Amino acid sequence: MPPLQLLRSLSALPDINPVVDFPAPNPAPKSTVAGDAFPSVYSTLAPHALTNLVFKHYDIEVPKGCRFWHRGLSDVYLVETLADDYILRISHQHWRTESEIQFELELLNFLADRDVPVAAPLRHRDGGYALEINAPEGKRYASLFPYAPGGVAIGDLSKTQGFLLGEMLAQLHQTAQRFKPSAHRPPLTLSYLLDDSLHTIAPFLHHRLEEWRCLIDISMAIKTQLTSIPTHTPYWTICWGDPHSGNVHFTAEDQMMLFDFDQCGMGWRAFDIAKFLQVSMQSGLGRNIRDAFLSGYNSIAPLTVLEENSLQALTQTAFIWSWAIHVQTLKLSDYSRLHGSYFKRRLENLQQLGSTDWQLF
């Protein structure tokens, strides 16, 4: 829905606090008496059971341990064997469809086959790359990856690493122009990045109309500025979706391995750069390193003047998209943080990104 229609529809929202609109579990229990399965929306799978699953379906050494490593947009487990370590990623039923997951895995295999250093999924014994799990809340999907050598840059990226990462992103974009997926996932259009995000945020600004109107005005200005960017190559290609220093490992020799393509999709290559800038500024990465990243990218695939002039609006777009994803996550895991000051602070950060000194923040 366009922003103006969203604004008009805001007055029609019920005068209640926003609630989490979860799909019913499949199949939904008919009752919740003792002995029946209670409905679930966000289960935690037992590491010992996942150890057995991995050993049964993958040609790896006997696991000596499995640890719940991180909960984010997927649940991540570290699987350890005597010889090697692996990352087991379990999708969330409410976040990704089977088709969206297959798209990502196809992309990773495509890039790895063309010498782009990505952590590609391992094939299981049945020939596929994802295992279906019947979790209490519905179907989830497990994929196993080799543990990326090296580690996250200590104290964040150096200038050299920033330059190298920019170079690699440009090479990824060029290589991915030939990617022909069999699976579908939504492209990173302004409708997906902005309009859908506003739908997520809108109910929480029901009683904060001034802030809502400000958000609408910013979104409309972004759309006006970005309407002239073409949607064909080289401007439009496969995007990583979340390029930043936390999603790449560097060895001591500055060899890199990229991972976490959960937010990938067809989009503007300049959006990937803007996403790097948005995350980097939010985490406090120095301007000199951000500039080195841009220099690295331009050394392989120079941006046009139109794209360079669009980076600020695209960085704001990336911020709004990330904001909406964060809201969706908090609705599941920490609703107490979704209070007025949270939205006030986020809007202030967004306004800073729209200032003439936006690169200073």
Curated annotation (Swiss-Prot):
A single GO molecular-function term is: homoserine kinase activity
Protein's name in the database: Uncharacterized protein sll1119
Cross-referenced Gene3D superfamilies, in alphabetical order? 3.90.1200.10, Phosphorylase Kinase, domain 1
Q: Name one GO biological process term.
A: threonine biosynthetic process
Species source reads: Synechocystis sp. (strain ATCC 27184 / PCC 6803 / Kazusa)
Q: Which family does it belong to?
A: Belongs to the pseudomonas-type ThrB family.
